[in-house]
Design a protein with these regions (language model features):
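Short, Lys/Arg-enriched N-terminal segment that forms or immediately precedes the first helix
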Residues: 145-159
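Short, glycine-/small-residue-rich phosphate/pyrophosphate-handling segment
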Residues: 80-111
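Conserved alpha/beta core of the MobA/IspD/sugar-nucleotide pyrophosphorylase nucleotidyltransferase superfamily
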Residues: 99-148
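Short beta-strand-to-loop acidic/aromatic patch adjacent to the donor-nucleotide binding site
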Residues: 44-55
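Conserved N-terminal catalytic core of the sugar/cofactor nucleotidyltransferase
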Residues: 1-46, 60
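Short alpha-helical "packing" element that flanks the helix-turn-helix/winged-helix DNA-binding module
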Residues: 169-170
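Short helix-boundary/capping micro-motifs
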Residues: 177-181
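Conserved donor-nucleotide/metal-binding helix-loop-beta segment in metal-dependent transferases, i.e.
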Residues: 57-80
Length: 182
């Protein structure tokens, strides 16, 4: 989007791979979804997709989705379909080939694999953060649920020579076949 460079600068030290839709002004959100799916295809068994304004679902919701055994699933809270959406790798080609009418929701409705809707008690799955007040309320709820380990590995001789930044550089160099593009 229009703030991609700013977001990338703020998040660059977090081990994130950034993908851009350079035609964001003239395309739909589903086109951006497809860019991400193309990149992730065959790199993992399942992915979890969420729009940027629905970031604060809980780890418990993620575990419920992953443990469901479904190839296509989403959480339901307060009678509403939410995020993240679980998509198995084998469904990515079908979604990429979809016409895009009604976006990802339409593609899931047309998918040959039925969507499993799973009830969860997690308001973060259905409430977006469009305003500062929305975001503050979601952050408060999310932080009350938050417990997570953080692990970092580096190799050191006299000075550290391999850390998460070098690992990311090597991953991106392998992906792009270019240090410059990485």
């Amino acid at each position: 989007g229009c703030n991609a460079a700013v977001l990338e600068r703020h998040l660059s030290g977090n081990g994130i791979i950034f993908l851009r839709n350079e035609q964001y002004e003239t395309t739909q959100m589903f086109d951006s979804v497809k860019i991400g799916l193309r990149y992730l295809q065959d790199k993992c068994d399942k992915i979890l997709f969420t729009p940027v304004d629905v970031p604060l679902f809980t780890a418990q919701t993620v575990n419920i989705l992953l443990d469901s055994g479904a190839a296509l699933a989403c959480p339901m809270c307060e009678g509403k379909q939410g995020h993240p959406i679980l998509i198995a790798n084998e469904l990515i080609p079908e979604i990429l080939d979809d016409c895009g009418e009604m976006g990802l929701k339409g593609a899931m409705d047309r998918c040959t694999t039925p969507l499993l809707r799973i009830d969860v008690d997690d308001p973060g799955t259905v409430h977006d953060a469009d305003t500062p007040e929305d975001f503050s309320a979601l952050v408060d709820y999310h932080n009350s649920q938050l417990v997570r380990p953080v692990v970092s590995v580096s190799l050191t001789k006299e000075k550290p020579f391999f850390d998460s930044k070098i690992a990311m550089l090597l991953t991106l160099t392998d992906e792009t076949k270019s240090v410059r593009a990485a």
